[in-house]
Regions:
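Short, acidic/small-residue loops that bind anionic groups at enzyme active sites
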Residues: 105-109, 117-140
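Basic, gly/Ser/Thr/Pro-rich low-complexity segments located predominantly at protein N termini
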Residues: 10, 14, 18, 115-118, ...
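Glycine-rich beta-strand-to-loop/alpha-helix junction loops that act as flexible
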Residues: 8, 54-55, 109-112, 130-132
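A broadly conserved amphipathic alpha-helix scaffold signal in soluble, globular proteins
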Residues: 96-99, 116-120
Length: 140
């Protein structure tokens, strides 16, 4: 596999249920850290192209800046250029673009809502879900 896509939802894990249930909150800075680890792990396995969904928090830009500054980045990172709406339509549009690009897989740090939107938008690309959402309920 030479390329992967990453769809990190900056809105996942911020539901009111997290606050009232004393659940762990995964803020967007931690999502940047998670995506950095995904990129480093992928490039360690031979991935040389990483495509990241553009988003309102600029997770992809922060990842590129941090890894370039640390001189750890060897893979090419590119943001998927879409018209941002700040809602699920960004996830759906990006997943469809990544499938058209034939990335090796999509890695999705997000919740069951993010992953459901991706799964409904793709047919052939494997999806790797990383739980960072509120409920994270997945059917069998």
């Amino acid at each position: 596999m030479t390329s992967i896509g990453i769809i990190a939802n900056p809105a996942s894990g911020k539901d009111i249920r997290r606050l009232v249930s004393h659940a762990t909150v995964i803020d967007n800075y931690e999502k940047v850290n998670i995506v950095e680890r995904i990129v480093l792990g992928a490039q360690g396995c031979g991935v040389d192209e990483v495509y990241i969904m553009a988003d309102t928090f600029q997770i992809g830009n922060r990842v590129m800046d941090n890894l370039a500054a640390s001189k750890e980045l060897k893979a090419n990172i590119r943001l998927i250029d879409i018209n941002l709406n700040g809602n699920v339509s960004d996830t759906i549009a990006t997943a469809k673009i990544m499938e058209d690009m034939k990335v090796g897989c999509i890695v999705a740090p997000g919740g069951d809502g993010t992953n459901r939107a991706i799964a409904k938008s793709i047919d052939k690309i494997p999806l790797i879900s990383l739980s960072t959402g509120t409920n994270n309920v997945y059917p069998d």
